[in-house]
């Protein structure tokens, strides 16, 4: 018989709809039993997603131990099996009527396909009318974790009704949580189900009751409530957020974000997302009318999106706006364009990339988000900025050019008065007063920067040699306000032109060695870098976007010590450095690496950024003939669990440490981790402005289900903690509970805040409470073990669109 098998057209929708709502977080199923609740059936086809896609076009094969009845009313007895593609239906007995389409399957009814497995007592129905009834069901998901049961299921075409159904991702022998519903209506054509009087139980205790709700049963989205978030903090009080999802169209949707904070009031938020063939975007807005603490309206708008113009060009934008300078402190969130704790950046631009070139045209603007500062701390706006880079090999040579043209603008700065009584709580409003007294008037200007270069990279198996010659030309067009700002000389069109020559050379030696019975490949990699740049007077040049690089091992091999084009240091210097590694030959892992280097200055370096027109540019120590600080980096893998690292800078001129850091990490069993770090940094200009911190964090598994988490981040100079986190986690096969207490510095004044966070993770379903994951992943490096081996997130790296000519040879 080769009739289409239509007995089970429904992949039992409750088994698919609930996991479709699951939170997108890493889940640990390691505590679950390895044995399936419903083991695979003998004789069933292997899971085959390709066969599942074409099952409707395949014939049905029926077999059994005995066949009786007539040609129109066949009866199969004993080990009855129906197979079609990836589908399998087994029963002890099967009676069919080919004229009426009726069938009855009884005794040990079993069904399996690529994504679903089920057992039942009885199944009956009519193939012609596509009506079916299955009783006493137990099911299991095959392609994901989940199982449950139902007293009965009635199917009519693509519409079904489940009676007294359950769903859980727990092991059936220990259902820590389950969803129960007396009645669930399912419509496969529309892609949704409707549950009535559904209850979420943890153990035997009902914790959530839904008298009526709709949910998706496939990838199609549906309007409805999402799981809430809630928490408690000293600043906001009780904090409750109830997302409401709106499915507006296949390619765009929205989420309403009503939020109640007992100390502030109601905040209204929304998130709108769109997607099309050439791009996508997202906009988020929040509005808090009459904040009870600040006594004024608060709000924010954030947008990010891109559009692919063609294979070479892409338009991108990231726009951020907040209503006041305390917004970021009061409503900490993942804000687009967060340049630092004191400012946010908005950018719009179009960017192109080819085989040998990159180009872009963009504009940006900065907004102040620190109430203790005035506009002098903000970077200049680039309105607009155009750049072009090109590089290409020519035989043994390589040539390239960097070109940039920028128009810089800046808002005038107005005086900020601190509170006279020293109180900085600000609960009754902004205690720092922004006055109408202008304390600095900013002019604007344009800058053109060109840097063509040619190099000759030569290399062999044990050496490399790269001579490079470049020419840098920088020209300005300044308005009269800026040109007449001290220390500038009044020249509205200053220029700078100078050559840059460098020679980079290195050797590579290796040998096989053995330590404590383990074979290693030991390398020795000396490197020398000579740089010559003649002196050019640059005090008549403004400083727009230029800052000194933080001195580090990588800085030993750059042709400038500045990030922007407003300063190009003069140099007659030689860097000598060496690196040595011990690589384990069995697997290539690095056991130990040591690097050290120093710059020898043959002349004083006269160019500095001091006394510039831009207060935000800071200042630097002048460089005299002699030697730079020694820079050393070391990493040591004690064993496969324990590693250490250190960075050290010692200044022979002051005979003091400029920088020191020590970090160690120990990996525990069951994904536990312990981190310990010490950081010291000396301000070479202001000895009173130093950094000395200790940081201890851990995830300690007490047993397979309980673990403790914590962080103690302490300022040794201020003698007070910067952040304290303590908490416990309980984990099981299908449920995780996290409880955290956090105390942290919330603003530049050093004020502390307290918060309590709870999160319940119903694995495979969703989570509710506050997002403790985000807090713990930031505070404990390695909270998720994979984070140790991933590329740093984009918000910790340089904007890829901000090409820096100083990083080009």
Swiss-Prot record:
Origin: domain of life: Bacteria
Biological process terms in GO annotation: Gram-negative-bacterium-type cell outer membrane assembly; lipopolysaccharide transport
The UniProt record lists the keyword Magnesium: no
Keywords for this protein: Cell outer membrane, Membrane, Signal
Signal sequence interval, chain numbering: 1-22
Compartmental location: Cell outer membrane
Disulfide links within the chain: none
GO CC terms: cell outer membrane; transporter complex
Cited function: Together with LptE, is involved in the assembly of lipopolysaccharide (LPS) at the surface of the outer membrane.
Family, similarity comment: Belongs to the LptD family.
Assembly description: Component of the lipopolysaccharide transport and assembly complex. Interacts with LptE and LptA.
Protein name: LPS-assembly protein LptD
